[in-house]
From Swiss-Prot:
Presence of keyword Transmembrane: yes
Name of the molecule in the record: Autotransporter adhesin SadA
Gene assigned in the entry: sadA
Sequence similarity: Belongs to the autotransporter-2 (AT-2) (TC 1.B.40) family.
Top-rank taxon, per record: Bacteria
Regions annotated as coiled coil: none
Cellular compartments annotated: Cell surface; Cell outer membrane
Amino acid sequence: MNRIFKVLWNAATGTFVVTSETAKSRGKKNGRRKLAVSALIGLSSIMVSADALANAGNDTGDGVTPTGTQTGGKGWIAIGTDATANTYTNVDGASAAMGYKASAMGKWSTAIGSYSQSTGDSSLALGVKSVSAGDRAIAMGASSSASGSYSMAMGVYANSSGAKSVALGYKSVASGATSSALGYQATASGDDSAAFGNGAKAIGTNSVALGSGSVAQEDNSVAVGNSTTQRQITYVAKGDINSTSTDAVTGAQIYSLSQSVADRLGGGASVNSDGTVNAPLYEVGTGIYNNVGSALSALNTSITNTEASVAGLAEDALLWDESISAFSASHTGNASKITNLAAGTLAADSTDAVNGSQLFDTNEKVDKNTADIATNTGSINQNTADITANTDSINQNTTDIAANTTSINQNTTDIATNTTNINSLSDSVTTLTDDALLWDAASGAFSAKHNGSDSKITNLAAGTLAADSTDAVNGSQLFDTNEKVDQNTADITTNTNSINQNTTDIATNTTNINNLSDSITTLTDDALLWDAASGAFSANHNGSASKITNLAAGTLAADSTDAVNGSQLFATNENVSQNTADITTNTNSINQNTTDIATNTTSINNLSDSITTLTDDALLWDAASGTFSASRSGSASKITNLAAGTLAADSTDAVNGSQLYETNQKVDQNTSAIADINTSITNLSSDNLSWNETTSSFSASHGSSTTNKITNVAAGELSEESTDAVNGSQLFETNEKVDQNTTDIAANTTNITQNSTAIENLNTSVSDINTSITGLTDNALLWDEDTGAFSANHGGSTSKITNVAAGALSEDSTDAVNGSQLYETNQKVDQNTSAIADINTSITNLGTDALSWDDEEGAFSASHGTSGTNKITNVAAGEIASDSTDAVNGSQLYETNMLISQYNESISQLAGDTSETYITENGTGVKYIRTNDNGLEGQDAYATGNGATAVGYDAVASGAGSLALGQNSSSSIEGSIALGSGSTSNRAITTGIRETSATSDGVVIGYNTTDRELLGALSLGTDGESYRQITNVADGSEAQDAVTVRQLQNAIGAVTTTPTKYYHANSTEEDSLAVGTDSLAMGAKTIVNADAGIGIGLNTLVMADAINGIAIGSNARANHANSIAMGNGSQTTRGAQTDYTAYNMDTPQNSVGEFSVGSEDGQRQITNVAAGSADTDAVNVGQLKVTDAQVSRNTQSITNLNTQVSNLDTRVTNIENGIGDIVTTGSTKYFKTNTDGADANAQGADSVAIGSGSIAAAENSVALGTNSVADEANTVSVGSSTQQRRITNVAAGVNNTDAVNVAQLKASEAGSVRYETNADGSVNYSVLNLGDGSGGTTRIGNVSAAVNDTDAVNYAQLKRSVEEANTYTDQKMGEMNSKIKGVENKMSGGIASAMAMAGLPQAYAPGANMTSIAGGTFNGESAVAIGVSMVSESGGWVYKLQGTSNSQGDYSAAIGAGFQW
C-alpha cells in the first residue's frame, strides 16, 4: 500500500496491466450464472499450493523435471531442457534449476536461466550463463559470476570472486576479499577495497576509489581521480593540527601556513591568490636579494670590508667609550678641547653640548649666587653648603680645564705630525672634512666649526659631573644647573625675610559661676529653664515631667512659632498616621543627638547643681525635636493659661483648647452636612441617571429593571460655571480630597535639624544664660502647682506662646501645635464647607436638568421644561453587540445607513444584468453564475442535507456536507461530491482493510481505507451508465495525489524483477526510479536520471546531466558528470573543470569530476585518512602538523637570522657613526687604500662612503668598497645594482645576534620543508618539496581527524565514512532486494498464471463443451489453470470461463464470450 499503482491481470486484453492501487477488477454478473458457478466449483476442486506440480513432468513425489534431470534424492526442481538439479537427504535443502541446461548442483542452490549454474551451497545464479560458485553467493545478470563465498555479482558480466565481495554493474569486478565494486566496469581487486563509479579501480588493500575513472593503487588509500585526471575534494572540514592528527587539511589551512611563512620571512613576502609565496626582497647596500641566505652573504661581505676599512679610523674621531658609556675627547691618550662649538640649546630635555661662553655665564651667575648666599648664611646654611660644593666643583673643573690645556698643547704637536700624512689624502677627504667633528691642531681641540661658523653638537649624552671629569656637558645639564642656581636665589630671598613666630596663646573661658548660685536657688525650683543635657527648655519639676497649663492658643499660620496645646489638633491628629513613621525616624535622630550631648556634659558639670531644680519645672527647648518640650518626668504635660493664639496663615502662636474645640465643632457640622448630602443623593439616585463606576458611564438602571434605554452619559463638567449634574464618583472624589487635606497636614511636618550647631555654641549659650537668668523668673513659662501644669500666665493675664515650631501631628503626640497648623486645618474645613454648599446647589440643579426617569413612559425622558422633545448631545458611541443596551449616537446610525447603501450597490453588482432579455439569453442567476433553464420545467436546486450545497438545474444534494454541481447531479452520501451533469455520488466509502480475493462474482481487489480520514467520494458519472475522463491532470507529487498516464508509464518502465541478496530496504516511502541507461537506483524516493548513474539512499537524486555520477546518502545530489556526492545532504557544485588554477600550482589543472562530502551550507570532516604518499593522495592533519612543526622550526631559524641581521645592522650603525667622524679615504695606521679612482662621496646626512667611487647618497647609509652605492636610508651597501660582492670568511654565528654563514643556513635548510627552486635559482613558491630532492616521495603521516569545515581528512575518517556508506548501502540494498524479490515473485507468479491460462485449449465444434487444464512457469514461479468452454449449437457463439492459482498463493479468474461467422 505504499505505491500508487499495482499490476493486475486484464482479462479483456489477456495481459497484465498497471492500474491504480484502489482499482477493482470485479465485473458485472451475466445471465450465464450456471456456467460460472460450475466452473468455479471445478476450479476450487483442483486448486493447489505453492509446491504444486508444473506441466506434465514426472510425479513420483520425489521432484519435478519437465524434461530435466536430477542427481538423486528428493525435493529438487529441474525445469527446462537438460536442466540439472542436485538435492539433499532433507527435503528442505533441495535445489532448483530452471532454464535450458540450467544447473543447480550446490545444496539448497538455485539456478534460473539458460546455462545458469549454481554450484555453491545456498547460492543463486539468475540470468543467462550466470554462475554462482561460492557458498551462499549470488550471481544476477547475464554471464555474471559470483565465485567468492558470500559474494554477490549483479549485472551483465559482473564478477565477485573475492570472499564476501560485491560487484554491482556491467563488467564490474570484486576480486578482493570483502571488496565492493559499484558501477560500470568498476574493479575492486584489493582486500577490503571499494570502487565506486564508472571504471573506478581499487587495487590496494583497504583502498577506496571514488568516482568515474578513479584509481586507488596504494594500500589504505583513497583516490578521487587517477594519474592523469584528478578531482578536487570540496567542502572538506578543517582537520585537527596536532602531533596525533591524521585528518586531511584544507586549502585554507595550507594558505594559512603559507601566510605564516611569508610573515616570518618579511621583506615584503606575501601569499598569492593561488597560495604560493612571493619571494622576499632584502636590500643590502645597493643589492637586492630574494632570499635570506643571499642577503646575509652580501651583508657579511659588507661588514667584513667595513671592519677592515675602519680599523685605523679611531685616531682622530670623537668615538664612543664603552668603559664610561660616553663619547671620549681623548686624543693620543690625553684629554682634549672641543673648539668652535656653537652654543647648545639650554632646556630640560636638551642633549646639546655647551661651549665655554655658556659655562662662563653660568659661572658668573654662580659667583653672584655665592655672594648672595653669604649674606643669608644664618637661615640657609644647607643651601650655602650645596652651592659651595658646586663652586668647588666648578673651580675643580677650571683646574681640570687648565690641565687639559697643557695636554691639548702636547696634542697640537702630535696633530701637526698627522697633518703631514693627512695632506696627501686631502683630495679624498674634502667632503668628510666639511662635516666631521675633527681635531683642530691650531687650537689644540676638536672644532665644531662648519663652513666657517660655529655649530652645535647635538645628541651629546650627559657628561660625567665629577672633580676629575673631562667629559663635555650637554645643554640639559647646564640648564639643570642654571635652574638650581635660580631656585637657590629665590630660596635665599625667601629665607632672608624674617620668619615670625606665630604662636598665639589660647585664652580659656573659665568663668566661675558660683556667684550665681544664690540668685537661681528659687528660680531653679519653679522656672521653665533650659536643660543643657537635653538642649531644650525642660518642664521637669521635682524630678518628674510636668504639664504646661494655661497655654494660650498659639497663632496658626505657616510661619507661626507659637506654642499650641494638645487639644487644638486632637481631632485632626486622629486622622494622621503617617507621622508615626516620621516620629520613629526622628526618635533615632534624637537618640543619636542624646549620645552626642552626653559627650559634652563634662564641660558643664559645674552648672548641674544650680540648674537641677530649674530644669524640672521650666518649659525648655528640646534640641532633639527642635521644639519647646512640655514633657515632665517623662510624661506629656499641659500648658495652661494660654491665651488664644492668632489664627492666620503666618501665625506662630500656640492655640488653646477653646480654639481647637471651635474647629472640631465645625468639623462635626461638616460631617453631619455631608451625611445629609449623602442621604439626598441616595434618594435622588432612585430616579436619576447616575454614574456607574463599573462601566465608566451613566447607567439607566431603575428599580428592578437593570437595563433601560439610555446609558453611558459622560460625567458632568466640573468648573466654576458648570451646571452639569455630578455623579457619586465625583462626590466621592471630593470626600477623598477632604481625606487628602488631612494627609497634607501631616506632610507639613518639617524635618528636625541636628543640634551640632547648638552643641558647638554651648559655651556661648551658657554665657547667655548667666546674663539673662536674673529676669528669667518673671518671664519664664513656669510650673503651676495649683493646676498641675505649666502656666502661660504673665502679669496675671493669659498670654500667647509665640515662635512655637510646628508640633508633631500623630495619635500619641504631646507636642504643642502652633497657629499656622490650626489655621491650615481651619482653612481646609472652610473649603470643605464651601464645597459642600456647592454640592447642595448642584444637586438642586440636577433635579431640574437631569435626564430623569419617566414612570408614565417607563423610560428615561429627554423632556426639559415645556419642551416635550429634546436632543441628547455628546452621547458616546454605544457598544454594538447582541446583548448591548447602550444608546447609539447619530454617527453610528449614519455609518449603518452608509453600509446599507454600499450593500445595495454590492447586491446590484453581484446580481449583474437583471433584464428579462439578458436572463432569457444567458440564464437565471447572479453575475458570473447562471443557469439557462429555457424550455425546461421550472425546477430549482435542492440542498436538503445539513451543510450540503446544490448548484445547477434540478441538482440535489441530500447528503450532509455533500456537493452536487451540474444539471440533474445528485450527491446523497455524507461528504460526497457529484461533479457534472447527470453525475451521481451515492456510494459510501467503506472504512476498513480488505485483501484481494476471488469470489463468485469475480476477483475483488483489496483496499486499505483506515490510514486517513475519509471525507467522501467524488463522482464524475453514474454507476454502470456513464463516466468521464479527467484530462489535463498535472503529475501527482504526494502519496494521495492523482497520477497521470505518463507517471504510470514511467512507473511501469521502472519496475525491475531482479532479486538481490544482501540488499534490503525498510521504508514506506515511494519506490526508487532508475531512468538512465545502465543506471542503478537504490533507496526510497531515489531517482537516477543519468546514464550509468548510481543513486543509493533516501531521496537521493542523480541529475540527467550527471552521467556516471554517484549520489550516496539521504538527500544526496549528484549534479555533474563523473562526480560523487557522498553523505546526507551532500551535493556536487562544480563537477569536472578544465584549466583551473589549483592551490599552490602554477600549471593549469584538469579534473574529470568532483567528490563532495557536504554542501555549501554544511561540510564534513573526512576522518581516519591515512597519510598520503603519491602526488595526488590526500594528506591528513598529522602530515600538515609535521610540516607546520618544520615551518615553526624554520620560522624560529628565520627569526634568529632576523635577530642576527638586526644585530649586524646595529654594529654597522655603530661603525657608521664612527666613520662619520673619521676620514673615509686615505691611510692611517690600520687603514690603507690602494686606488687612484674617484673620491668617495658621502652625500646623505650621517652617511659614510668608503672606497674609490663609493657613494653614500641616502641618510644614515653606508657604502663599503669601490663603486659601492648606498642610495636608500639606513642601509649598508657593499656593491651596486650592477655589481655585487660576497661577504666571505664569515665565522659561524653563536649568539642570537651573530651573523650566520652559508654552512649554517644549509644545515638549517637540510631538515626543513622547502619550496621548489626555479632554473635561475629563485624560489618557486607554487611547489613545496617534502622530500630530499632525490625523486622519492614523502607521506604526511599522523594526520588528525578533520574537525573544521575545510579540514583535510585522514584515511581513518575516509575509511570509516566508506564503511558507513557500505553498511548503509548494504542495508538499503538488502531492504530493496526484499521488496524487489517480493515484487518479482508476485509478478513471476502472475506471469506463470497468465501463461497457464493462455495454454488452456477450448471447444471449437458447434454444440461442443470442453473442460481443460494447463500449467505454466516463469522465473521460478509456477501456476496451474483450469477452464470450461462451450460452443453454441449454431457454432456462432463461443463462451469461456477459466481460473488459475500460482505458487505465490494468488488466485485469478477470467470469463469471455465471442461471436464467429
